[in-house]
């Protein structure tokens, strides 16, 4: 990593922070660790790391400060240790930057095929797309590791073997700060308002995502072009419409001589140089319900085609993909009523896409509202029979739902019970909160687990 014999401060001692400290120590650096919480410091001390408060103990002789993704470094208020690093001229990086530096310095002379990295970013669909890429590669017999926001931390993966593909899911928190971003293939799924306070607005949010493409210049880029930001990004990356480095992905019809993958009415189609190269029916794939998952499938398809896989191999792998927990996860069918957990739909765009995947919906929503308002949901709510609102501020959230029929429930147990009592055979009780979970839960996973637990009570 280039820090042999040098001091590096690691700020934040959760999973990624401790992994960074271990990797730095193994690479010959002196890792100095700090966390504002006593528990984090205790974990680091138990592993033999030096505890070093960068404010109290200073930054003299420090070559770099490595921070965890959850710690603000710019907006809304940067952590004081990062401010001190800026003032002292100390570079600030994160585990993603360390990973790419380490990979770039690797000796792959004994590999017939050096490892390749696929990095996936975007507002929604990152996890499903990343997991689906890894699943397809595994089914095809290609060695693969899944890391980043999904799977293991990037510094916890095994040393890559010959021909292996490393698939990394990256959030805007990670792409914004990493000092090295050099994937072989980069994916941009879509963009919608999220994390705006952290990035100083929509422009800053998009700029954070865009760094994945502008910093390292990936050999291939798979870009969702349904939004103007994706169209702009695609236009910035190529020399002309026939530039084979770009694969455009859309839920609508695309034209031109380039390399395109589109999903319309449940069919995935690949076009190259204006001619159709493949067509796959996604309508009966149980692990990929709805138009939003078809877009995820198109992104994964584009990556795997760029890696040399045949369409029939990808199609066969689609059929065996089981989906991810808390993302359009079918939990149960009780008396003809379906229960679906999409707790990961933490913003308006994700919830809108979830609502578009089902016919008659009993919609459980609410939580910690994000910037941007909820008005965009109104048009997507045509299939909603009633909304069942949860959250500490459920009354206020309900006021933003317009004319959608609603029942202010407050907690998950009440919402599931009332939705179940109202539901008719053929209905779907859908948890798609359109909000963060932190008012009542410590994560969207915990919220989804509560939904599942309440449904299991109905079954028993």
Curated annotation (Swiss-Prot):
Matching Gene3D superfamilies: Mur ligase, C-terminal domain (3.90.190.20), Mur-like, catalytic domain (3.40.1190.10), NAD(P)-binding Rossmann-like Domain (3.40.50.720)
InterPro entries per UniProt: Mur-like_cat_sf (IPR036565), Mur_ligase_C (IPR004101), Mur_ligase_C_dom_sf (IPR036615), Mur_ligase_cen (IPR013221), MurD (IPR005762)
One Pfam family matching this protein: Mur_ligase_M
Single GO MF descriptor: ATP binding
Biological-process GO terms, alphabetical: cell division; cell wall organization; peptidoglycan biosynthetic process; regulation of cell shape
Highest taxon of the lineage: Bacteria
UniProt pathway: Cell wall biogenesis; peptidoglycan biosynthesis
One GO term describing the cellular component: cytoplasm
Positions annotated to bind ATP: 122-128
Family per record: Belongs to the MurCDEF family.
Function, in words: Cell wall formation. Catalyzes the addition of glutamate to the nucleotide precursor UDP-N-acetylmuramoyl-L-alanine (UMA).
Name this protein carries in UniProt: UDP-N-acetylmuramoylalanine--D-glutamate ligase
Organism for this UniProt entry: Jannaschia sp. (strain CCS1)
């Amino acid at each position: 990593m280039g820090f042999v014999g040098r001091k590096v401060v690691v700020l934040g001692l959760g999973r990624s922070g401790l992994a960074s400290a271990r990797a730095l120590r193994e690479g010959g650096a002196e890792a100095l660790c700090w966390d504002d919480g006593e528990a984090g410091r205790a974990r680091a001390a138990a592993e033999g790391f030096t505890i070093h408060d960068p404010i109290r103990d200073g930054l003299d002789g420090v070559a770099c400060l490595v921070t965890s993704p959850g710690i603000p470094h710019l907006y809304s208020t940067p952590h004081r240790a990062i401010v001190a690093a800026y003032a002292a001229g100390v570079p600030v990086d994160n585990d993603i930057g360390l990973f790419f530096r380490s990979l770039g310095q690797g000796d792959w002379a004994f590999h017939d095929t050096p490892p390749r990295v696929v990095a996936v970013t975007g507002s929604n669909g990152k996890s499903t797309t990343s997991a689906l890429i890894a699943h397809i590669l595994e089914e095809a017999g290609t060695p693969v590791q899944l890391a980043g926001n999904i799977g293991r931390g990037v510094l916890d993966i095994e040393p890559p073997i010959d021909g292996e593909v490393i698939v990394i899911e990256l959030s805007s928190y990670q792409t914004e700060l990493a000092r090295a971003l050099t994937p072989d293939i980069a994916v941009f799924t879509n963009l919608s308002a999220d994390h705006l306070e952290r990035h100083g607005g929509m422009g800053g949010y998009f700029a954070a995502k865009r760094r994945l493409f502008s910093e390292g210049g990936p050999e291939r880029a798979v870009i969702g072009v349904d939004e103007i930001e994706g169209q702009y990004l695609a236009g910035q990356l190529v020399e002309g419409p026939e530039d084979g480095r770009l694969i455009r992905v859309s839920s609508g019809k695309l034209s031109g001589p380039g390399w395109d993958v589109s999903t319309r009415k449940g069919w995935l189609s690949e076009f190259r140089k204006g001619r159709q190269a493949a067509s796959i029916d996604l309508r009966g794939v149980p692990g990929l319900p709805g138009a939003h998952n078809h877009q995820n499938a198109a992104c994964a398809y584009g990556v795997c085609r760029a890696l040399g896989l045949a369409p029939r191999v990808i199609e066969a792998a689609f059929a065996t993909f089981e989906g991810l927990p808390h993302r359009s996860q079918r939990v149960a069918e009780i008396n003809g009523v379906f229960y679906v957990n999409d707790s990961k739909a933490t913003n308006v765009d994700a919830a809108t896409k979830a609502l578009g995947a089902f016919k008659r919906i009993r919609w459980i929503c609410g939580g910690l509202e994000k910037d941007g308002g909820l008005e965009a949901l109104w048009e997507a709510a045509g299939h909603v029979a009633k909304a069942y609102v949860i959250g500490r501020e459920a009354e206020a959230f309900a006021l933003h739902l317009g004319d959608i029929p609603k029942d202010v429930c407050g907690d998950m147990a009440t919402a599931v019970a009332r939705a179940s009592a109202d539901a008719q055979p053929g209905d779907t009780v859908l948890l798609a909160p359109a909000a963060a979970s932190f008012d009542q839960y410590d994560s969207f996973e915990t919220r989804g687990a509560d939904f599942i637990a309440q449904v299991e009570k109905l079954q028993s």
